[in-house]
C-alpha cells in the first residue's frame, strides 16, 4: 500500500511567500494570514504592528537574505488577543535535606495575525554622508570669525 499524500506538508504550496523575522529575542517563520503567539507586546487589540528586523524573505521566484537584516523590508501584524500560556511547574529539591520548593510560571503572550510581508525596492537619491559634509562646509563659510 502506497500513500498518495504529497510530501512537504510543512510548507504551504498555495502561498509561497514567507519571511523569517526576529521579535521578542526569538526568530519566527511568518506566513501571511496565519496566527502566531509571541511574547507580550505593549499594544491593544486590533492595533497594527510593524516588524523591521527581517532576516530572510522568500517569494515565488527569489530569496532575499539580510546581513543581518534586510533593508526596506517589513511585516505588518495585527494584534488579535492577549492571553497566558499554560503553567510550567518548577520543582527544586535538595536530597537528604527537608528543603523543597515548588513554583509555577505562566508566560504572558500576544496572539498576532500576519497581514502582509513586503520589501520595497527603493534606491537612495544621494548618500547622507555627502549631504552632511556639504551642510557643514557651507555653515562654516557663512559664519564670520571674530
Curated annotation (Swiss-Prot):
One cellular component term from this protein's GO annotations in UniProt: ribosome
Basic residues composition-biased segments: 95-104
UniProt feature, compositional bias: Low complexity: 115-146
Short name of one Pfam family: Ribosomal_L21p
Keywords assigned by UniProt, alphabetized: Ribonucleoprotein, Ribosomal protein, RNA-binding, rRNA-binding
GO molecular function: rRNA binding; structural constituent of ribosome
Disordered: annotated segments: 95-146
InterPro entries: bL21-like, bL21-like_sf, Ribosomal_bL21, Ribosomal_bL21_CS
One GO process term, biological-process aspect: translation
Disulfide bonds: none
PANTHER family from the UniProt entry: 50S RIBOSOMAL PROTEIN L21, LARGE RIBOSOMAL SUBUNIT PROTEIN BL21M
Family: Belongs to the bacterial ribosomal protein bL21 family.
Biological role stated in the UniProt entry: This protein binds to 23S rRNA in the presence of protein L20.
HAMAP family named among the record's database cross-references: Ribosomal_bL21 (MF_01363)
SUBUNIT field: Part of the 50S ribosomal subunit. Contacts protein L20.
Protein name as it appears in the record: Large ribosomal subunit protein bL21
Organism whose genome encodes this protein: Prochlorococcus marinus (strain MIT 9515)
